[in-house]
């Protein structure tokens, strides 16, 4: 079901944990877990020694690429459950395992019958996703069957939980039945997910003008706008994505909405800044980020004239993640400051 309503959270609610305990007869860990930034810190400090990735390209997606690589290399074991190779498979712990799995476009015959999963979009719509393509290999397993297999193997070491892992993967309706009983909003899950177009999860303000606030009304908050003032010679760098990109997957080098093509190591800069520094378009430069007295330098970038406010520059994600210091995070969310990085730029002769 994914990481939105489905419960993938390093700080799950007591209500959700209680529901899991009632459904499966186990006692889930209630200790608060670690977000992405904290996980990298824990691996670097040796507090976490096993890293398991359910898809994705953690190394490339994470801030401070070199620090993240160092943390992964400190692990005793790194495991990647993946549909295709990526950079994270090449930077590993002492022992590394790659478990290839079926992609959502591939036909899933786990349990001897056609299976499907559901996905949830950012609008809160849940719908079924059925693969039809021939799998790349007859030996590929689905993600649910891989996870169940890992669980069964662990239980042979640490003791049985009472969960029938084989039944969960023999028919994915069984998994969805458990989701229905543990996550609010998934009533009649197996029936509704088969409806063309799927179904909407509850949204109290939309559904009935109900606001879960202390006043029972919609609360509006105003904040004063703040500008980040940088020292002379510095810029504020933001990372962006191109048109032909989905997360860390790059499908081509044609960012057609911006009129940029042929490469990705570009520094988009205002014309006035280029002229004021005596630079020129397509000039090769290095970028250095600055945070709390520390610096990170990355070379091999090219200046592109672009309609962006003076003293601001833009670079593509994930190539410029290397410049975002691990400790440079947003207040509250603890997410990397990918839209606000202080940098200086120097020409390379």
Write out the residue ranges for each language-model feature:
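Segments of small-molecule ligand-sensing domains
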Residues: 188-200
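Short acidic, Pro/Gly- and aromatic-enriched capping/linker segments at domain boundaries
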Residues: 199-207
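Segments forming glycine/polar-rich beta-alpha architectures that bind adenosine-containing cofactors
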Residues: 211-212, 218-219
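Short, flexible helical or helix-coil boundary motifs
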Residues: 182-186
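Non-catalytic alpha/beta scaffold blocks inside enzyme catalytic domains
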Residues: 1-179, 233-236, 240-349
């Amino acid at each position: 079901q994914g990481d939105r309503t489905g419960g993938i959270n390093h700080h799950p609610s007591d209500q959700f944990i209680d529901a899991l305990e009632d459904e499966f007869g186990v006692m889930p860990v209630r200790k608060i877990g670690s977000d992405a930034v904290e996980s990298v810190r824990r691996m670097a400090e040796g507090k976490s020694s096993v890293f398991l990735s359910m898809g994705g390209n953690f190394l490339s997606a994470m801030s401070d690429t070199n620090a993240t690589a160092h943390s992964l290399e400190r692990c005793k074991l790194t495991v990647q459950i993946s549909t295709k190779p990526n950079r994270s498979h090449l930077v590993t712990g002492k022992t590394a395992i790659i478990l290839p799995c079926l992609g959502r476009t591939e036909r899933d015959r786990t349990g001897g019958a056609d299976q499907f999963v559901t996905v949830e979009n950012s609008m809160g719509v849940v719908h079924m996703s059925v693969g039809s393509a021939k799998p790349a290999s007859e030996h590929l397993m689905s993600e649910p069957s891989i996870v169940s297999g890992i669980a069964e193997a662990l239980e042979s070491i640490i003791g049985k939980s009472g969960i029938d892992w084989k039944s969960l993967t023999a028919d994915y309706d069984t998994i969805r039945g458990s989701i229905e009983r543990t996550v609010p909003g998934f009533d009649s899950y197996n029936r509704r997910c088969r409806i063309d177009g799927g179904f909407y999860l509850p949204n109290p303000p939309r559904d009935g003008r109900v606001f879960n606030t202390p006043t029972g009304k919609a609360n509006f908050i105003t904040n004063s706008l703040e500008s980040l003032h940088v020292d002379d010679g510095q810029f504020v760098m933001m990372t962006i994505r191109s048109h032909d990109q989905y997360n860390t997957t790059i499908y081509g080098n044609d960012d057609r909405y911006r009129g940029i093509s042929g490469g990705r190591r570009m520094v988009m800069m205002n014309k006035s800044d280029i002229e004021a520094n005596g630079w020129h378009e397509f000039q090769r430069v290095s970028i250095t980020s600055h945070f709390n007295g520390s610096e990170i330098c990355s070379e091999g970038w090219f200046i592109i004239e672009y309609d962006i406010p003076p003293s601001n520059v833009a670079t593509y994600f994930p190539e410029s993640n290397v410049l975002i210091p691990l400790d440079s995070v947003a207040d509250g969310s603890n997410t990397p400051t990918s839209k606000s990085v202080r940098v200086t730029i120097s020409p390379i002769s």
